């Protein structure tokens, strides 16, 4: 990869991945230090520790909850920006727009879910928190499969297979983790369910980091123009100009 030919926009998915993963691990270590959750490598429950190391429990009490809310809000914003830019990137290249639109809507709903689970802690409002979790995991998984299909179909710069196959593999791993997570939860095997949850989230973040492969080929610009109430068409402008020149003669 030639750094001189890469767009700076390639760093957006990477910043999303690195920032969110680092923030979540900071929340985890704060919660472990305060004895709010068990460590992920713990084999037995310690006295005084209340919960298995689920992410929701880690970010349930201050000060970890403050960091968790901020991380999830920033992650939701960055994911929304990535969703819009990815949609714009693929829009002129897909014949059937519905798959691209579905990818945009799915990631927007997943982003909304991030704000719900980040701002409504589990013990404060369990119902809304669980809705946010379902939106994030459900539509996040759907987004992964849609983007994997679009990657193979559009084949930007003939890199479709190189980027698409790892995304298909990650999508399969994410789907397996989601199913396994709910199975373990239903059987009250909480330590293993928590480990699967952390693995699931890290796979999500790694997946979106791979979007840097296509983003490095594109440059995005925001065009700002002043609104003119009495806007004249090009022909009207020429007509006025010719009349002015006639008057001068």
UniProtKB/Swiss-Prot annotation:
<keyword id="KW-1003">Cell membrane</keyword>
<feature type="topological domain" description="Extracellular">
    <location>
        <begin position="190"/>
        <end position="192"/>
    </location>
</feature>
<feature type="transmembrane region" description="Helical">
    <location>
        <begin position="131"/>
        <end position="151"/>
    </location>
</feature>
<dbReference type="InterPro" id="IPR050911">
    <property type="entry name" value="DRAM/TMEM150_Autophagy_Mod"/>
</dbReference>
<dbReference type="InterPro" id="IPR019402">
    <property type="entry name" value="Frag1/DRAM/Sfk1"/>
</dbReference>
<feature type="topological domain" description="Cytoplasmic">
    <location>
        <begin position="152"/>
        <end position="168"/>
    </location>
</feature>
<feature type="transmembrane region" description="Helical">
    <location>
        <begin position="169"/>
        <end position="189"/>
    </location>
</feature>
<dbReference type="GO" id="GO:0005765">
    <property type="term" value="C:lysosomal membrane"/>
</dbReference>
<keyword id="KW-0812">Transmembrane</keyword>
<keyword id="KW-0472">Membrane</keyword>
<feature type="topological domain" description="Cytoplasmic">
    <location>
        <begin position="1"/>
        <end position="9"/>
    </location>
</feature>
<feature type="topological domain" description="Extracellular">
    <location>
        <begin position="119"/>
        <end position="130"/>
    </location>
</feature>
<comment type="function">
    <text>Nonselective cationic channel with high permeability to Ca(2+). Component of a mechanosensitive cation channel. Confers mechanically activated (MA) currents with slow inactivation kinetics. May contribute to proprioception.</text>
</comment>
<feature type="topological domain" description="Cytoplasmic">
    <location>
        <begin position="214"/>
        <end position="249"/>
    </location>
</feature>
<feature type="topological domain" description="Cytoplasmic">
    <location>
        <begin position="86"/>
        <end position="97"/>
    </location>
</feature>
<dbReference type="GO" id="GO:0140135">
    <property type="term" value="F:mechanosensitive monoatomic cation channel activity"/>
</dbReference>
<comment type="similarity">
    <text>Belongs to the DRAM/TMEM150 family.</text>
</comment>
<dbReference type="GO" id="GO:0071260">
    <property type="term" value="P:cellular response to mechanical stimulus"/>
</dbReference>
<feature type="transmembrane region" description="Helical">
    <location>
        <begin position="193"/>
        <end position="213"/>
    </location>
</feature>
<feature type="transmembrane region" description="Helical">
    <location>
        <begin position="10"/>
        <end position="30"/>
    </location>
</feature>
<dbReference type="Pfam" id="PF10277">
    <property type="entry name" value="Frag1"/>
</dbReference>
<dbReference type="GO" id="GO:0019230">
    <property type="term" value="P:proprioception"/>
</dbReference>
<protein>
    <recommendedName>
        <fullName>Transmembrane protein 150C</fullName>
    </recommendedName>
</protein>
<keyword id="KW-1133">Transmembrane helix</keyword>
<dbReference type="GO" id="GO:0005886">
    <property type="term" value="C:plasma membrane"/>
</dbReference>
<keyword id="KW-0458">Lysosome</keyword>
<feature type="topological domain" description="Extracellular">
    <location>
        <begin position="31"/>
        <end position="64"/>
    </location>
</feature>
<feature type="transmembrane region" description="Helical">
    <location>
        <begin position="65"/>
        <end position="85"/>
    </location>
</feature>
<feature type="transmembrane region" description="Helical">
    <location>
        <begin position="98"/>
        <end position="118"/>
    </location>
</feature>
């Amino acid at each position: 990869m030639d750094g001189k030919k890469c767009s700076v926009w390639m760093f957006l998915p990477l910043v999303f991945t690195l920032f969110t993963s680092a923030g979540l691990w900071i929340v985890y270590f704060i919660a472990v230090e305060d004895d709010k959750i068990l460590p992920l490598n713990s084999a037995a429950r310690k006295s005084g520790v209340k919960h298995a190391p689920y992410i929701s429990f880690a970010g349930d009490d201050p000060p970890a909850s403050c960091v968790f809310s901020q991380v999830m809000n920033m992650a939701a914003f960055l994911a929304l920006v990535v969703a819009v830019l990815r949609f714009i990137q693929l829009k002129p290249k897909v014949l059937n727009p519905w798959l691209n639109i579905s990818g945009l809507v799915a990631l927007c709903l997943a982003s909304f879910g991030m704000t719900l689970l980040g701002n409504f802690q589990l013990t404060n409002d369990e119902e809304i928190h669980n809705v946010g979790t379902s939106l994030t995991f459900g539509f996040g998984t759907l987004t992964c499969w849609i983007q994997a299909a679009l990657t193979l179909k559009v084949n930007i710069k003939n890199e479709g297979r190189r980027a698409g196959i790892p995304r298909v593999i990650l999508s399969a791993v994410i789907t397996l983790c989601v199913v396994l997570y709910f199975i373990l939860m239903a059987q009250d095997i909480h330590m293993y369910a928590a480990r699967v949850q952390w693995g699931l989230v890290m796979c999500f973040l790694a997946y979106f980091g791979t979007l840097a492969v296509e983003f490095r080929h594109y440059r995005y610009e925001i065009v700002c123009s002043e609104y003119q109430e009495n806007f004249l068409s090009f022909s009207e402008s020429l007509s006025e100009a010719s009349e002015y020149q006639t008057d001068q003669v």
